[in-house]
Amino acid sequence: MGSKTLPAPVPIHPSLQLTNYSFLQAFNGLPVPAEHVPNLYGFSALHAVHLHQWTLGYPTLHLPRSSFSKVPGVSSLVDSRFQIPTFPLFPHMIHPKQESPNLSNKTKPRFDFANLAVAATQEDHCKLGLMNDQGSPPAMGGLLDVTKLTPEKKPTRGRLPSKTKKEFVCKFCGRHFTKSYNLLIHERTHTDERPYTCDICHKAFRRQDHLRDHRYIHSKEKPFKCQECGKGFCQSRTLAVHKTLHTQVKELKPSKIKC
């Protein structure tokens, strides 16, 4: 017969005899009467808990001093004359379904900052791969993708974002205007529409202000007068053209004197 390897024996503290191991089994989560514990073979309750922790190989769990006295069956084992130091307890009695915090920290993966760009591209490919059976993306994913595709206008530093101006485009030549009235007057040059007609001579005009200036001719009234020569005009634009003549004469006079 071949030799079989036997399981390793349970390690026992040298100061504890084999007869005391039944004490540890009785102490494993069960309340033990106080009269059975004190000075059992010269072994205190505090030593028993330490040895129970070391024998069964549980990970260390540090608790405050007050938590030890709250464990069922342990408060009667503690001598009130001594203060309880902070030492590890058996975790299976306090948190049976919860792992030690030290183990959870070890298993938690760390973020790799060196491969940050590669991880970002992989996440984008994974998001693109998430599609429904019908070939359409999810509802929330579609909304997020639309917001990414729309260009964002960042406001300039120190200034509020300006409102986008409306543009009115001529359907004949494609010229842009910021006001609808200017577009209307411009389109009349293409259509030759003249809705404003003079009552006296029946001359038609595209704009109402042009008709108003025309009426001054019939009334012989010239409200627009030049301040330099005193000549009167019926229309303001005619006076503006007349003023340019005076400015041109002033520019020519100094040049003649220099020659």
Curated annotation (Swiss-Prot):
One of its GO terms (molecular function) is zinc ion binding. Its main location: nucleus. InterPro entries: C2H2-ZF_Transcription_Reg, Znf_C2H2_sf, Znf_C2H2_type. SMART domains: ZnF_C2H2. It comes from the Eukaryota. GO terms for cellular component: nucleus. SUPFAM superfamilies: beta-beta-alpha zinc fingers. The keyword Transcription applies. It is found in: Nucleus. Keywords: Developmental protein, Metal-binding, Nucleus, Repeat, Repressor, Transcription, Transcription regulation, Zinc, Zinc-finger. GO terms for biological process: cellular response to retinoic acid; negative regulation of DNA-templated transcription; negative regulation of transcription by RNA polymerase II; pattern specification process; pronephros development; urogenital system development. The keyword Repressor applies. At early gastrula stage, expressed in the involuting mesoderm and endoderm. During neurulation, expressed in the pronephric primordium, following expression of osr2. During tailbud (stage 35), expressed in the rectal diverticulum and in the kidney ducts. A zinc finger (C2H2-type) spans 168-190, 196-218, 224-246. PANTHER family: ODD-SKIPPED - RELATED (PTHR14196), PROTEIN ODD-SKIPPED-RELATED 1 (PTHR14196:SF5). Belongs to the Odd C2H2-type zinc-finger protein family. Transcriptional repressor. Required for pronephric kidney development. This is Protein odd-skipped-related 1. It comes from Xenopus laevis. The gene is osr1.
